[in-house]
């Protein structure tokens, strides 16, 4: 067992214990998060429009903040996109994640410095919970494929724009960088078919132990792997 796998087991147990403490008091845990979010956003335009200063309970929130879709929030989003501050969240976001827009065109989701860690930690913690439950940590010594959109970002009004998976690529922990595949150059390829073939070419003879990404992407890469011969 390697030092890395031993460390992974120790860290996994720590994260599991933290999650268990939250799970044992779910209402209290969620209410603390609720209060923190309301307090942080009460001076924003959205917070003022919806009387966040008066919201003390979940019932207050239901009365003041109606359920709505993206189009109903688009006016706020457009203000943030051109650099206005304190609209949906304090200050302005560091990123905008652009979705494919399957229903009504592209959608832009703001990502703040407070929210970015949750995107990384959620994936990390899923793996750590698996390690804690099974005791299997040997896979951390193998290569790991992260199927992502292009990490190349554009910038407007001090905010960077890109695909969510491409944005998250900038936040892969240092301790995973050595095991990470494909290469940065391959991740930057826009054409999907070319990208898949390049990924397979880079990884087919490696000891791959983890693959992550949108299920359809994982399926495509896995199928392509199966159709190509490996080196003897």
List each language-model region with its residue ranges:
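A short, hydrophobic C-terminal helix/tail in secreted or cell-surface proteins
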Residues: 227-232
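Active-site phosphate/ATP/adenylate-binding loop shared across adenylate-forming ligases
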Residues: 1-29, 34-51, 55-226
């Amino acid at each position: 067992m390697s030092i890395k796998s031993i460390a992974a087991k120790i860290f996994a147990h720590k994260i599991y214990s933290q999650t268990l403490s939250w799970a044992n008091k779910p209402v209290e845990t969620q209410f603390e998060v609720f209060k923190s979010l309301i307090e942080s956003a009460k001076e924003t335009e959205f917070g003022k429009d919806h009387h966040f200063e008066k919201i003390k309970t979940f019932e207050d929130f239901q009365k003041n903040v109606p359920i709505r879709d993206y189009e109903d929030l688009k006016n706020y989003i457009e203000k943030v996109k051109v650099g206005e501050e304190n609209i949906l969240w304090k200050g302005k976001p560091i990123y905008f994640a652009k979705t494919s827009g399957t229903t009504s065109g592209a959608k832009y989701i703001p990502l703040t410095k407070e929210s970015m860690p949750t995107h990384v930690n959620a994936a990390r913690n899923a793996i750590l919970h698996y390690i804690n439950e099974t005791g299997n940590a040997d896979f951390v010594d193998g290569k790991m494929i992260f199927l992502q959109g292009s990490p190349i970002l554009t910038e407007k009004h001090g905010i960077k724009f890109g695909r969510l998976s491409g944005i998250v690529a900038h936040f892969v922990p240092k301790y995973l960088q050595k095991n990470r595949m494909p290469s940065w150059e391959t991740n930057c390829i826009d054409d999907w078919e070319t990208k898949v073939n390049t990924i397979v070419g880079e990884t087919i003879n490696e000891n791959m132990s983890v693959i992550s990404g949108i299920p359809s992407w994982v399926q495509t890469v896995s199928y392509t792997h199966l159709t190509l011969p490996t080196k003897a």
